[in-house]
């Protein structure tokens, strides 16, 4: 039997961050992943904002950056578009090469002192007097791992968390996603990501083209709600109709679920922490979860290491993880579901009006009050929705403007 202080299940970005920070904090750590190659297959559109890496104290590395991004274009259902650049809004980002990025994050965990076990499937986890016993199937046969603290980072609707009595099921708002990595994509600018809105494009969701340079891009979409069409059927229709993809050819396909419901009911318990997609640490509006999950992993690892030093693994001690994550994520994962519901209630006509009005704004010379003036030019029902949305997303700014 292998004995350790902390075991992390899943070597995605969140799990690797948890393992890294637990090891940096002095704990003995084992990081387990069921795949024979960390990072494959990729699970997302690979887009991140650069500010997130500053929060994580990670220096961007050209080896895992496919493309730097300096702007975004939103396409409305009627064919109009609105573009914002980093000159207008001080936000930049990257399109990652996840197969490289995930490996580097795992290597950082190893350099911090974590032991990595690949092609090892955790088949069962049970409590004992010391914490947990994990049963694992590996290439060397069946092995057992005993740990004082377990960190579940095993993806949406965590199987291991369920085995421990945690309700990790996403009851609703599981975004169904389909994506192709494609070549010969005719995008206008490889430094801008593109979003396509409309119920025919993606019901209660959106489609995206994330360029990776040299005509290569991730082309995908996510849908929510009740629909007779699958995400795969939606993406095939989109690729056929979108001018940018009419000559594109697929080189990889990814299909899966994205939990945009917000945090699960419980992300910690006695001897247990849950992070990443397993915890619902995903932006409820746009479905991004790389940075959000890594912040969760960093918080989980830090708290686990301190708990090991104190020899206190109770849920009362591990509650610090919840507080730390809420602080690091600005509590957005808990507040944004209400904003998501507003965004996904927009009709095609409302999207058309929003994009049309947005094009009247001079982003380089506009105040917060000017934004409200533009919003009030819209139909009353849409204005009400947007005011509610702005109050949720920018509560402090809206309070200072309105009161």
Curated annotation (Swiss-Prot):
Required co-factor(s) are: FAD
Which SUPFAM superfamilies does the record cross-reference, listed alphabetically? Answer: FAD/NAD(P)-binding domain
List its EC numbers: 1.3.-.-
Q: What domain of life does the native source organism fall in? A: Archaea
GO MF, one term, reads: flavin adenine dinucleotide binding
Q: Which InterPro entries match?
A: DGGGPL_reductase, FAD/NAD-bd_sf, Geranylgeranyl_Rdtase_fam, Geranylgeranyl_reductase, GGR_cat
Q: What's the catalysed reaction?
A: a 2,3-bis-O-phytanyl-sn-glycerol 1-phospholipid + 8 A = a 2,3-bis-O-(geranylgeranyl)-sn-glycerol 1-phospholipid + 8 AH2; 2,3-bis-O-(phytanyl)-sn-glycerol 1-phosphate + 8 A = 2,3-bis-O-(geranylgeranyl)-sn-glycerol 1-phosphate + 8 AH2; CDP-2,3-bis-O-(geranylgeranyl)-sn-glycerol + 8 AH2 = CDP-2,3-bis-O-(phytanyl)-sn-glycerol + 8 A; archaetidylserine + 8 AH2 = 2,3-bis-O-phytanyl-sn-glycero-3-phospho-L-serine + 8 A
Residues bound to FAD are 14, 33, 44-45, 47, 98, 122, 277, 289-290
Task: Tell me the cofactor note.
Answer: Binds 1 FAD per subunit.
Record's Gene Ontology CC terms? membrane
Its GO biological process annotations read: glycerophospholipid biosynthetic process; membrane lipid biosynthetic process
Tell me the keywords, alphabetical order. Answer: FAD, Flavoprotein, Lipid biosynthesis, Lipid metabolism, Oxidoreductase, Phospholipid biosynthesis, Phospholipid metabolism
What is its pathway?
Membrane lipid metabolism; glycerophospholipid metabolism
Q: What class of enzyme is it?
A: oxidoreductase
Q: Which HAMAP family match?
A: DGGGPL_reductase (MF_01287)
State the family named in the UniProt similarity comment for this chain. Belongs to the geranylgeranyl reductase family. DGGGPL reductase subfamily.
Record's function text: Is involved in the reduction of 2,3-digeranylgeranylglycerophospholipids (unsaturated archaeols) into 2,3-diphytanylglycerophospholipids (saturated archaeols) in the biosynthesis of archaeal membrane lipids. Catalyzes the formation of archaetidic acid (2,3-di-O-phytanyl-sn-glyceryl phosphate) from 2,3-di-O-geranylgeranylglyceryl phosphate (DGGGP) via the hydrogenation of each double bond of the isoprenoid chains.
Any extra remark in the record? Reduction reaction proceeds via syn addition of hydrogen for double bonds.
Q: What is this protein called?
A: Digeranylgeranylglycerophospholipid reductase 1
